[in-house]
Structures are given as structure tokens and as C-alpha cells.
Regions:
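Signature for phosphate-centric chemistry
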Residues: 33-158, 162-333, 337-432
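Bacterial N-terminal signal peptides that target proteins for export
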Residues: 6-18
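Residue-level micro-sites within transmembrane alpha helices that shape
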Residues: 13-14, 27, 76
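Bacterial N-terminal signal peptides
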Residues: 17-28
Length: 432
């Protein structure tokens, strides 16, 4: 007679455990628990693989007499397929185990799902997805609607791009949507190795391989300390006869799980996260976020190197803004590149939030990648001028108004261009 009561208690405990996990994910990833959608909360564990989140636009009115006249922009490519060998390595490991009869029933289901992902990546490694194209079209429309004084009449837009296909296709979608909003505009396009180096700007492109090795050693040690991979491997593999690098497998399959949100249009409903426990998602998500922050952002341990690599990009913002201030025909400068170009720039400028300097092991909480470097992340410097010719600038990062550490606003979020220009010029001199 007591059995139903016991079963009810067990079910209640399970429900409470799931509810507690949802709250813990929200806290661990720095999320204000405003969105009860479990899918969104879990997808934020994807770090820089997280797709862009569009939120309400909120603009603080400029000081009296000032109107926007020019936008200087940097946009990361939109949602994409995985780069590297994550998918291929995961598929090979599972196929080998299947051949040897070493997959559990859950492992067999995982293999079926990974085959679908591998098919979506065939001859398309790293390429933009439909969701990524949609992100850039929507971002362009929102920018044009937000600053109608800039995007009117017959003016000129200058576009620079890194050389990878996903970046070029992102640029195409953005500029086509912007052309629809401003049909009288003309667009100039340029790309090449010169622009790839400037727009990508990471430390690994500057011959400092020893720093990259130190970052890898530090993040690998963090992974070994924080990821308990044994339960996952035991659920997928039925015996140890097929050799498996358990930690690598856990990290690879988590990257595969993370990219599924970017393929939502191509693989609707496919969910690899279901093969993980809540604790595994938390640990693997933290590790991924810390790895990406250490690689590209303003970490206490390694940040000086990637920030130094963004000085040429900062100089480009400075010089092109000076040209636009002197030439009313220039409406915007658009740049399209990668996370490794944008995140260091945020640190160099001193943006509160994306440019914060914290120990890399705390970055999953204190500077979360899902918030500051999702797919299609963007920076917009919006320039304002009054009748007297005074120039102010405000910075939008992922369409949010930003504070610049160490500069006095007049008032916030508006800053004197002369003050920001002096900072950018000073940083350029430091690198010489």
C-alpha cells in the first residue's frame, strides 16, 4: 500500500532536482533568471558557439543639438558550422566502437544523431548556416531603423572583410539588408590577406606560439580538474576494447552539442545535450567558456597578448572616423571578421563587460562568453555632431549602450570623440 507514496516521493525529488539545476545554470553562467525557457539556458553553455540573442533596443537620448551622422562597425560572422575536427573525430570514435560492438543502446542513438550532424558538415566545415545569415540581415535592419539620420540620402558605405567564406557571406547578407533599407547608398568592398590580419588580429597570428601553448596547458589542466568524464563514457561505451580518449571525447561531443543551435534551420529538433547530465553540461560549459576567454579576451594571465594584436584594428577605427568626420558623404564603415578580432578590441578600448580583466578560471561567471561573444557579436561606434561641429560618440556592443572604463561621459553613454581618440592613439603608440 505504501509503494505509490514512495514512487510519488521519488518523482517529486527528481522534479526538484531538475528545478534546482535550472537555477544553478542561471547562476553559474551569470544569467538573470528572466527567461524560463530551459532550452535557452542550456544553449548558453555553448560559449562562443551560442547563437545571437536579440533583445529590446533601448536608446538614451543624446545631448540637445546632437544628431548621429556616422557609424563605425565590427561584426563577427553569424552562426556557423563547427571548424576543426570535432565532428569527424567524434564520428570516427563512435563508428569504431560500433564496429567492435562496444556501443550501448544510448551510444547507438548518439551515433545516429552524430551522423546527421556530420552530413550537415560534409564539405561545409566552418561555413555559415541559414541562422547566421538571418542574424546579419536582422542586425542590419535594426541598425538602419535605429539611426535613420545616418542611413538616408545618397551616401557611401565602406566594407572590409576577412577572407573566410562565413565572413564574406555574413557581409553579403548584412549589406543586402542595409541596401534594402537605404537604396540610394553605394557600397565599396575589399578583402585580402592584409585585411584578414588586421580584422582577425589574434596572438596566434603574431608568432607568439609559446603563449598559445601556455593557454592550452592552462585550459587543459582546468578541464582535467573540473570534468568528470567517466559517467558519460560509461553511458555511451559498453566495454573498453575500443580505445577512447575519454576527456577528449567528452569535450568534442560537447562542442558538437553546442553547435546544434546554429544548425536549427538545417537540423530542426536535433538535441545532443540530452546525452549529458545537468552536472556535465555545467562543467563542460564552464570549461569551454574559460578556454575561449583565455584564448581571446582580457584575462589576467594572458590578456596583454591578444589585446596587443588588436592595435592595428583600433587604428583603423581612428583613421576612418577622422575621414568620415571630414567627409559628409561617408555614412558608415563596416568590418566583418571573427571573435578573435572583436573580443581583444573590447579589452583594448576598455569596455565594461566584454573588456573586463578577470582570472580566466572565473570568466565563465564574471565575463561570460555567451553574453559577450556569441555568433554575430558586434560593436558599433555611433558618432554624433552638433551645429558647432563638436563630435560625441557612443559605443554599442551587441546593440547595448556601453561604459568605457576611465573616460568621463558627457553624459553617459556619450563620450567626447577627442577623449576616445586620444586613448586609441595612445594605445597605438604603446605598440611602436
Amino acid at each position: 500500500m505504501k509503494m505509490p507514496s514512495i514512487v510519488m516521493r521519488i518523482k517529486t525529488i527528481k522534479r526538484l532536482a531538475i528545478a534546482w539545476w535550472l537555477v544553478s545554470v542561471a547562476v553559474n553562467f551569470g544569467i538573470a533568471f528572466e527567461q524560463p525557457d530551459r532550452v535557452l539556458e542550456v544553449e548558453r553553455s555553448a560559449s562562443v558557439y551560442h547563437s545571437y540573442e536579440f533583445s529590446e533596443i533601448d536608446d538614451t537620448p543624446p545631448p540637445k543639438g546632437f544628431k548621429p551622422f556616422y557609424v563605425s562597425h565590427y561584426g563577427r560572422h553569424g552562426s556557423r558550422r563547427l571548424t576543426g575536427t570535432f565532428v569527424a573525430d567524434t564520428l570516427a570514435t563512435l563508428e569504431n566502437a560500433q564496429k567492435n560492438g562496444d556501443l550501448t543502446e544510448e551510444g547507438k542513438r548518439l551515433l545516429i544523431d552524430v551522423r546527421k550532424i556530420a552530413e550537415a558538415h560534409e564539405d561545409m566545415i566552418g561555413q555559415l548556416t541559414e541562422r547566421g545569415a538571418q542574424e546579419h540581415r536582422r542586425l542590419a535592419r535594426r541598425m538602419a531603423a535605429r539611426f535613420p539620420d545616418v542611413f538616408k540620402d545618397a551616401r557611401r558605405v565602406r566594407c572590409q572583410s576577412a577572407i573566410f567564406h562565413r565572413v564574406l557571406i555574413s557581409q553579403a547578407n548584412f549589406t543586402m539588408a542595409l541596401k534594402d533599407a537605404a537604396p540610394a547608398f553605394t557600397f565599396d568592398f575589399i578583402t585580402g590577406d592584409k585585411y584578414q590580419k588586421m580584422l582577425n588580429g589574434p596572438h596566434w597570428a603574431r608568432g607568439t606560439a609559446n603563449v598559445a601553448e601556455k593557454i592550452k596547458a592552462a585550459t587543459d589542466a582546468y578541464a582535467k580538474e573540473n570534468i568528470d568524464h567517466a559517467p558519460l563514457v560509461e553511458r555511451i561505451f559498453s566495454s573498453a576494447s575500443s580505445p577512447v580518449d575519454a576527456l577528449k571525447f567528452a569535450r568534442d561531443i560537447f562542442a558538437v552539442a553546442s553547435i546544434c543551435q546554429c544548425l536549427r534551420c538545417e537540423l530542426a529538433g536535433l538535441d545532443i545535450y540530452r546525452y549529458f547530465t545537468a552536472e556535465e553540461i555545467d562543467a563542460l560549459g564552464r570549461t569551454l567558456a574559460c578556454e575561449h576567454y583565455a584564448d581571446m579576451a582580457n584575462s589576467v594571465e594572458f590578456g596583454d597578448v591578444p589585446l596587443d594584436g588588436s592595435r592595428k584594428l583600433a587604428r583603423d577605427f581612428l583613421e576612418r572616423a577622422d575621414e568620415a568626420i571630414a567627409d559628409d558623404g561617408i555614412a558608415a564603415d563596416l568590418r566583418f571578421g571573427h571573435d578573435s578580432g572583436l573580443w581583444p578590441l573590447a579589452g583594448l578600448i576598455g569596455l565594461e563587460g566584454p573588456g573586463d580583466r578577470v582570472p580566466f578560471a572565473d570568466s565563465w561567471r564574471d565575463c561570460p562568453a555567451w553574453k559577450w561573444m556569441p555568433m554575430a557579436s558586434n560593436l558599433q561606434m555611433v558618432f554624433y555632431r552638433n551645429a558647432a561641429g563638436e563630435v560625441l560618440v557612443k559605443i554599442l556592443y551587441n546593440e547595448r549602450e556601453m561604459r568605457i572604463r576611465g573616460l568621463e561621459p558627457v553624459p553617459w553613454p556619450y563620450y567626447r570623440w577627442a577623449d576616445l581618440r586620444a586613448r586609441l592613439l595612445g594605445d597605438e603608440k604603446k605598440s611602436n
